[in-house]
């Protein structure tokens, strides 16, 4: 009977749970799904991470290559994120060129990289005007069940913290790059951006970490990205219900709390990996 009601009136079905301050999956309104992270998942990448947020699963691989620095910024390198949402992860996606959600997510990740200064582009310059690193950050969703922005942001941060680059010098006589693979160092990850997403129901009720179904039924979504100092790096609000200043402040404070939880989880995994 309940399954039939959910099929015929999915929104009303959800409302009955929300009135009791809970959700159909058993979580409270402010409760996140179980979150796990593994780093170094792809042996052929320069850095990688696999993040699971409930059923939503994202893997990020970072590949470093050489390139000439931009003409207008000769002392900088590049960070190039790309998000792939293949049909493999959900029946809602089709084969072919990237769909709108994949493009929006890629742009969101690019904005997070730029606004948070997680990697300073100057740190990627090897020789000004001559040579710089390009970090290709490929994020692939393996299983889609909502809140892709949080999962991608976490996977990117974890993968960047796993990247080790070899020492590179320019031979003055030949003007060629010489790579010392025996001498590698970790990237200088300067900040720790963490995304926290919310769904709005009936224009007033906020829930955190929405599933795919909750996103579909909601009247709007909001993603807040904060750094380790509690500073706002990004705010992503793709239309939908408006929010009062008090609601936004509530989202900010919840995002700061979530940042501490995610940072603690990532630090524990990194420490265990580096002590192996």
From Swiss-Prot:
Transmembrane portions of the chain: none
- The answer to whether keyword Mitochondrion applies is no
Which GO-annotated molecular functions does the record name?
identical protein binding; mRNA 3'-UTR AU-rich region binding
- Where does the record place it? Cytoplasm; Nucleus, Nucleolus; Nucleus
Q: A GO biological process this protein is involved in? A: rRNA processing
Q: Which branch of life, at top level? A: Eukaryota
Q: Which family does it belong to?
A: Belongs to the RNase PH family.
Q: What is this protein called?
A: Exosome complex component RRP43
